[in-house]
Regions:
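A short acidic, glycine/proline-enriched capping/turn motif at secondary-structure boundaries
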Residues: 62-65, 91-93, 113
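Short amphipathic alpha-helical segments and helix-helix/interface helices
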Residues: 45, 72-74, 93-96
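Non-catalytic interface/targeting segments
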Residues: 1-42, 97-113
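C-terminal structural segments of small proteins and small subunits
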Residues: 79, 83-108
Length: 113
């Protein structure tokens, strides 16, 4: 469960993180870097796609500056992931907390801008 989020920091299950991360079902990858910083591409989420969650949540940053192209969302869905939720990171945290107990879910968060 995500306990809190503020610009540059997220608290998950009692632990604080200050770098972009991916929450998998059984672990947290806390060094998530994208090839192009504020632009996400298929290579940046290959491991997520390989795990085929039912839901992928993408937090685009405090101000929502990370870009998620519609073409990428289409490619994600065509890979078998049923639902893709793209929101500013604060809103994405709320979505994650609503869904994580009842769905096979993975969430990727940009924590700053």
């Amino acid at each position: 469960m995500i306990e809190s989020y503020k610009f540059g920091q997220i608290s998950i299950n009692g632990k604080n993180y200050s770098s972009d991360l991916i929450i998998f079902e059984d672990y947290i990858y806390d060094s998530w870097w994208r090839k192009e910083g504020h632009n996400i591409c298929i290579d940046d989420i290959k491991e997520i796609i390989d795990k085929k969650p039912d839901v992928l949540i993408i937090g685009t940053g405090y101000f929502g500056l990370m870009k998620v192209p519609q073409k990428l969302i289409k490619n994600i869905k065509s890979s078998g992931i049923k639902q893709v939720i793209v929101k500013k990171s604060g809103e994405a945290c709320n979505e994650y907390n609503k869904l994580y107990k009842t769905n096979k879910i993975i969430a990727a968060f940009h924590l700053t801008c």
